[in-house]
Amino acid sequence: MWKNIYIDNQETNYSISDTGEVKNNKTNKILKQQIQNGYCHCTLSVKPKPKRCRVHRLVAQAFLENPENKEFVNHKDGNRQNNNVDNLE
């Protein structure tokens, strides 16, 4: 399942899957992800300048409810590269 990515409440040309893939909606290509400090990142071309995003946060923002406005996203299995929505809380 795919959902649009919003940055600062603005819709972007990107989508995030419930498994943690990021897609450019204009080209339909999956973005390559980099790993830093154990977390998967990708860079989105948004104005006024590109934004580097942690993939687990994009998944959580799109697929998880956060009624208490919790600041952190936890990987249930401790694997920071497992960004499946079922592994996040």
Task: Enumerate the predicted regions with their spans.
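Conserved recognition-core residues within compact binding domains
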Residues: M1-V73, D77-E89
